[in-house]
């Protein structure tokens, strides 16, 4: 039986008090609805239809991935009405899985189990709460079979005492869905077409109704306000932190590490507090990440140390290199084995060769630095003339003195030495000493100006 997934993402989310559609608010740096789409793809459905409404152009522009189908819900008339908008993409012999764009953390494992028990039946994902107030109740008969779902505003006092609630996630044979949706009525307290009313129609039709529950409560928790958004962020980060620790990483405080993408760790990795990882990041064995670091789309090899408050983006760092504290590696930076980038150093689109050092207060951009090079404090590669970028080539075993400006394009040959305070505008050959600075003058009898 083919699988069709419908994701409901049309709501405005007025309680968010935001110009942004609710489903475009983020957990772990990713829009809520993108989490749902990514999970849906792991189920390998025939198609995924996203039902959009409020600011649909923002939703369509803000999610990624090929092959999404879109259905417009011009008026928000309830969940049953929303699902009906996506029916044109569903084949009658398939099964429809209904998901919600503001319920981001449902796992693929939970959904696979749910689909397995729902084949050919009406499946309802439920959960049991100590305080079910506000949710639709699962009403069962004396035999324990589900006979209806009653929304909070329509429930009797006896029904309000039921603590098994509907999560909203359903699996339905498409042919039955097309049969039941036109029969829905909006004669209820909300004046809406409830998708949950198909349960009573299933009972009338003699269709079996089955239920399943998720492994964790946060898998079915939705977002209606920013407090709930923050709670799901913490739940997600706690889950990721536990996975990292089980994979061999030590987190100094699991509550103070944020992963906003995919983080792969080797053995005996150490991550200090307030580290943020974004995009795709790989940490090799025995990598040490200091406090307050931001690492985005980086590959960091074994035995690398990243000191406190360093920022690394789209960079590669080879084994035994060290970075920071307070260093910045921008896109295109590559530190080779045992290279060192120290405090208040910025590297952009540059290779720093094996064993080379840029220890303090320097900028190296659009450059290739060979092996065993020492770049003194305050060195700048002047790579931009206001219109174009130019490259600096520093070959092996070069020594660059402090407070030096290297005006690109320029090449420093192997073993060259640059005197401190130089502004180098011409190539320096192998093993040459270059000194390019004004001659010092000492003036006797100098009197400092005084304030008038």
UniProtKB/Swiss-Prot annotation:
Entry EC no(s): 2.7.7.23, 2.3.1.157
A GO molecular function term, named singly, is: glucosamine-1-phosphate N-acetyltransferase activity
- Segments for region (Pyrophosphorylase): 1-226
Location of this chain's protein in the cell: Cytoplasm
Which Cys-Cys disulfides exist here?
Answer: none
Q: Does the keyword Nucleotidyltransferase apply?
A: yes
Chief subcellular location equals cytoplasm
Picking any one GO biological process from the record gives:
regulation of cell shape
Query: Which portions of the sequence form the region N-acetyltransferase?
Result: 248-452
Which cofactors go with this protein?
Mg(2+)
* Stretches for region Linker: 227-247
List where this protein forms a coiled coil.
Answer: none
Q: Which SUPFAM superfamilies match?
A: Nucleotide-diphospho-sugar transferases (SSF53448), Trimeric LpxA-like enzymes (SSF51161)
Q: In which pathway does it act?
A: Nucleotide-sugar biosynthesis; UDP-N-acetyl-alpha-D-glucosamine biosynthesis; N-acetyl-alpha-D-glucosamine 1-phosphate from alpha-D-glucosamine 6-phosphate (route II): step 2/2; Nucleotide-sugar biosynthesis; UDP-N-acetyl-alpha-D-glucosamine biosynthesis; UDP-N-acetyl-alpha-D-glucosamine from N-acetyl-alpha-D-glucosamine 1-phosphate: step 1/1; Bacterial outer membrane biogenesis; LPS lipid A biosynthesis
Sorted alphabetically, the Gene Ontology cellular component annotations on this record are: cytoplasm; membrane
Could you tell me what reaction this enzyme catalyses?
Answer: alpha-D-glucosamine 1-phosphate + acetyl-CoA = N-acetyl-alpha-D-glucosamine 1-phosphate + CoA + H(+); N-acetyl-alpha-D-glucosamine 1-phosphate + UTP + H(+) = UDP-N-acetyl-alpha-D-glucosamine + diphosphate
**How many cofactor units bind, and how?**
Binds 1 Mg(2+) ion per subunit.
Q: For binding acetyl-CoA, which residues are annotated in this chain's numbering?
A: 377, 383-384, 402, 420, 437
Name the family. In the N-terminal section; belongs to the N-acetylglucosamine-1-phosphate uridyltransferase family. In the C-terminal section; belongs to the transferase hexapeptide repeat family.
**Its function?**
Catalyzes the last two sequential reactions in the de novo biosynthetic pathway for UDP-N-acetylglucosamine (UDP-GlcNAc). The C-terminal domain catalyzes the transfer of acetyl group from acetyl coenzyme A to glucosamine-1-phosphate (GlcN-1-P) to produce N-acetylglucosamine-1-phosphate (GlcNAc-1-P), which is converted into UDP-GlcNAc by the transfer of uridine 5-monophosphate (from uridine 5-triphosphate), a reaction catalyzed by the N-terminal domain.
Q: What is this protein called?
A: Bifunctional protein GlmU
């Amino acid at each position: 039986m083919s699988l069709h997934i419908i994701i409901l993402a049309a709501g405005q989310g007025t309680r968010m008090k935001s110009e942004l559609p609710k489903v475009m608010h983020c957990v772990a740096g990713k829009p809520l609805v993108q989490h749902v789409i990514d999970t849906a793809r792991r189920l390998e459905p025939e198609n995924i239809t996203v039902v959009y409404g409020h600011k649909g152009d923002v939703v369509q522009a803000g999610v990624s991935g090929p092959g999404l189908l879109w259905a417009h819900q011009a008026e928000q008339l309830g969940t049953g009405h929303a699902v009906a908008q996506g029916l044109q993409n569903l084949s009658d012999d398939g099964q429809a899985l209904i998901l919600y764009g503001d319920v981001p953390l449902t796992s693929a494992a939970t959904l696979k189990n749910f689909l397995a028990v729902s084949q050919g039946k009406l499946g309802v994902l439920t959960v049991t709460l100590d305080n079910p107030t506000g949710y639709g109740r699962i009403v069962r008969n004396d035999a324990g079979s589900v006979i209806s779902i009653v929304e909070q505003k329509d429930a009797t006092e006896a029904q309000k005492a039921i603590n098994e609630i509907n999560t909203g996630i359903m699996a339905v044979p498409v042919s039955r869905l097309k049969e039941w949706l036109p029969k829905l009525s909006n004669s209820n307290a909300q004046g809406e077409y409830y998708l949950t009313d198909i349960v009573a129609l299933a009972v009338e039709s003699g269709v079996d109704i089955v239920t399943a529950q998720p492994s964790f409560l946060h898998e079915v928790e939705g977002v209606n306000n920013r407090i709930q958004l923050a709670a799901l962020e913490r739940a997600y980060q706690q889950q990721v932190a536990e996975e990292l620790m089980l994979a061999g990483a030590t987190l100094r405080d699991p509550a103070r590490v944020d992963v906003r993408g995919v983080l792969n760790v080797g053995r005996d990795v150490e991550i200090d507090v307030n580290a943020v990882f974004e995009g795709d990041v790989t940490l090799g064995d025995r990598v040490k990440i200091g406090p307050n670091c931001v690492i985005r789309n980086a590959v960091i090899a074994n035995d690398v140390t990243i000191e406190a408050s360093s920022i690394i983006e789209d960079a590669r760092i080879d084994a035994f290199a060290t970075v920071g504290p307070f260093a910045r590696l921008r896109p295109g930076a590559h530190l080779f084995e045992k290279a060192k980038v120290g405090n208040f150093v910025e590297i952009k689109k540059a290779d720093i060769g094996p064993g080379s050092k840029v220890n303090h207060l320097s900028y190296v951009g659009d450059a290739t630095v060979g092996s065993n090079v020492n770049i003194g404090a305050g060195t700048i590669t002047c790579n931009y003339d206001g219109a174009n970028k130019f490259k600096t080539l520093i070959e092996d075993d070069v020594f660059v003195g402090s407070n030096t400006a290297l005006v690109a394009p320029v090449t420093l040959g192997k073993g060259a030495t640059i005197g401190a305070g130089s502004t180098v505008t011409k190539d320096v050959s192998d093993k040459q000493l270059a000194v390019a600075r004004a001659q010092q003058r000492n003036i006797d009898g100098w009197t400092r100006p005084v304030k008038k």
